[in-house]
């Protein structure tokens, strides 16, 4: 079996269906004898350029080990699913299991302390004086 890295982007209006799609795709991979080495849900992200007049999409990354028949089934599933805007399937030499750069950046952002609240802007004294008169 060969190793593959799969990234697919889902229409932002269908973000709530992503978990079901991931379960369906991972089930089809494991039923065919493949394994999922890494699965990351990157969430909604800005696109580099508009696709079908959309500026955001929900990203999912998978690293799997499977046969060619599984890849063909996934390509068909992506092609006939209108929610999937784009997909990319790349063959890799080895199984990639470490956390991706995108996921690391997201974890670091969560670990940082939240920003201090902004000070409230007070109304101008002139406006208060005219209101009293």
UniProtKB/Swiss-Prot annotation:
Pfam family, one: Ribosomal_S6
Record flagged with keyword Amino-acid biosynthesis: no
Top-level taxon in the UniProt lineage: Bacteria
GO BP terms in the entry: translation
Cellular component annotations (GO), alphabetically ordered: cytosolic small ribosomal subunit
CDD domains: bS6
Compositional bias annotation for Basic and acidic residues: 106-125
Region (Disordered): 106-133
Classification via PROSITE patterns: RIBOSOMAL_S6
GO terms, molecular function: small ribosomal subunit rRNA binding; structural constituent of ribosome
SUPFAM superfamilies with a match to the protein in the record: Ribosomal protein S6 (SSF54995)
Keyword annotations of the record: Ribonucleoprotein, Ribosomal protein, RNA-binding, rRNA-binding
Function: Binds together with bS18 to 16S ribosomal RNA.
UniProt family annotation: Belongs to the bacterial ribosomal protein bS6 family.
HAMAP family hit by this protein: Ribosomal_bS6 (MF_00360)
Protein name, entry field: Small ribosomal subunit protein bS6
UniProt organism field: Psychromonas ingrahamii (strain DSM 17664 / CCUG 51855 / 37)
Gene (UniProt): rpsF
């Amino acid at each position: 079996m060969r190793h593959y890295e799969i990234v697919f982007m889902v229409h932002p209006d269908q973000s709530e269906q992503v978990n079901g799609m991931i379960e369906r795709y991972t089930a089809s991979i494991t039923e065919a004898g493949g394994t999922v080495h890494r699965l990351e849900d990157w969430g909604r992200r800005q696109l580099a350029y508009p696709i079908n007049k959309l500026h955001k999409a929900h990203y999912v990354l998978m690293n799997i080990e499977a046969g060619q028949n599984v890849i063909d089934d996934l390509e068909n599933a992506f092609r006939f699913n209108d929610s999937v805007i784009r997909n990319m399937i790349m063959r890799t030499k080895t199984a990639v299991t470490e956390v991706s750069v995108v996921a690391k950046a997201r974890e670091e952002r969560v670990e940082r302390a939240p920003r201090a609240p902004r000070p409230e802007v007070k109304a101008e004294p002139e406006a208060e004086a005219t209101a009293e008169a």
